Amino acid sequence: MKRFVILLLTAVLALTMPLSALAAGQIEVTEDISVSADYDWTRFKGQNVTLNVYNWGEYISNGSDDSVDVVAAFEKLTGIKVNYTTFDSNESLYAKLKSGAANYDVIIPSDYMVAKMISEGMLMPLDYSNIPNFQNIDEEYRNGDYDPENAYTVPYTLCTTGIIYNTKMVDEAPTSWADLWDEKYAGNILMFNNSRDAYAIGAFKSGSSVNPQTTEEVDTVVDELKAQKPLVQAYVMDEIFDKMIGSEAAVGVYYSGDAITMIDDNPDLAWVFPEEGTVLSVDSMAIPATSEHEEAAEMFINFMCEPDVGKANIEYIGYTTPMHCVWDILDEDLKYSEIAYPSEDIAAKEEVFTALSDEVNSELDVKWSEMKSYDEGGSGYLFLMLLAAMLALACFNIWRKVRRKTRNMY
């Protein structure tokens, strides 16, 4: 993969452009955000339109820690109100949409979940006349296998998975996914609390594909995860922030962008790409088929692809941008981050999730649930044993009292 080289060449070209050209035709929304004037941003003003946006937690610049409030800027510019809520895994996003429990206008699923949703008719085709900023998306990140013609999605960010560890709590840095099965880390390991990412770790460890083709493959890899379970402190998603920043665990697995955020908050933390490889994911913006505000949703997606907006988001969340025009204006530390923009050697070992067959996906869901409940079942058994012992003791005490009373009668 040549993304770093491509972005570097783009930066050189950008330096040759007149500054006046970069600033031409702009509307200033806030001190930090200007947008293209060649777009009708105000056509929904006064129409009481509300967009329901469903995104990952900690995945947009929200005004905290002196960041830009991107949603507030969109509302100010367009007059559209945004009801912004979050999820913590692709699986919970899918379940929420599938159940019909809520109606959303913009969602941000990962590549393999996009493919699944497309196949099930859950996404609405996009009208790119309302998303001219799609031109800002780098060619390298268009037409992915999960959405071959970008008919349904616009890339938002990219990320990889790896190991984050506390340098004060480990004797030497982990180098392999297999290190997460080392008993020296017992009780100090944080694992993904979603089946697909956790499965990938077991697959890397066992030399299997992260995209299983048979139920037998699933069973074999989940057995690896089951063997690891006694060593795991907790299965987490966003909870990892507090635990790693607060030095409550020695090692954890998570996404590259969030690792940058955690390391910024705790300098004792460090990151490693395991030697077996890593998963590269593309998270994309999409519109559910049930949305009643398609055009306004497309306006939101177009806004998110504005360079200043992209810069604000990427600098806040630390993820990899799919837009060269955003990379060009990033702060230097992030622009050249080896976590966000890994070397060619690491990129060569990147694997990409693909949609699983219904049979394999069902098997993974079942085996993951069984693995997660394994200790819970044991704990439940111990609870019943304890309860039985308490009842037996109570019965024994009652028997003693009755026996004593009987003796006294004679």
Regions found by a protein language model. Give the residues of each.
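Sec-dependent signal peptide cleavage junction
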Residues: 15-29, 402
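Early extracytoplasmic/lumenal segment of secretory-pathway proteins
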Residues: 23-116
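Extracytoplasmic ligand-binding site segments that recognize negatively charged/polar headgroups
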Residues: 52-67, 88, 102-248
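A ligand-binding cleft/hinge motif common to bilobed small-molecule-binding domains
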Residues: 113-116, 245, 251-268
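Ligand-binding "clamshell"
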Residues: 118-125, 145-150, 262-273, 333-338
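Periplasmic-binding protein-like
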Residues: 136, 159, 218-227, 233, ...
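Mature extracytoplasmic/periplasmic domains
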Residues: 288-349, 390-393
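Conserved C-terminal helix/tail region of periplasmic/extracytoplasmic solute-binding proteins
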Residues: 344-410
